[in-house]
């Protein structure tokens, strides 16, 4: 690829910064899925939306509200060094593994950024794009500290 996109991390190339595996018919998927393992999205905002949708499912369906339980499900030991991932995220967002996160942009934006950084070795997105994708995911979900 002449524009250097082939040198970008896989998740950034695929517009899937959470490295979400194929299997769900996500909104915003590219018409051509060129990666045999991971989803390819039309635009990064859709990959960010999918990442946040998963985190909201963890919160509201599986009652995962702290970094330890969220990352243990996101990056299970069968595929990852889960403890190192948890440590990385906790340092990035300055919380302890069992600190409960509020269902708010103030808590989830840093979490999403740290997941993207861990998955790709970088976090190249502006906050505005991240927030747009996150709010697309939040449609229909409650927000705020009382939302569990």
Please annotate each region the language model reported.
Residues 1-148:
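Cell-wall polysaccharide-cleaving catalytic domain and substrate-binding groove, primarily
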């Amino acid at each position: 690829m002449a524009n250097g996109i082939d040198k970008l991390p896989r998740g950034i190339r695929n517009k899937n910064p959470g490295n979400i595996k194929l299997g769900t018919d996500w909104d915003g998927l590219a018409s051509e899925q060129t990666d045999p393992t991971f989803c390819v999205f039309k635009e990064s905002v859709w990959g960010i939306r999918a990442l946040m949708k998963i985190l909201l499912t963890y919160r509201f369906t599986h009652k995962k509200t702290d970094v330890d339980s969220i990352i243990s499900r996101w990056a299970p030991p069968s595929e990852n060094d889960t403890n190192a991932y948890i440590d990385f995220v906790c340092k990035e967002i300055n919380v302890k593994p069992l600190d409960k996160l509020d269902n708010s942009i103030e808590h989830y934006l840093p979490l999403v950024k740290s997941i993207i950084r861990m998955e790709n070795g970088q976090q190249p997105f502006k906050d505005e794009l991240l927030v747009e994708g996150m709010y697309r995911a939040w449609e229909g979900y409650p927000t705020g500290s009382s939302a569990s």
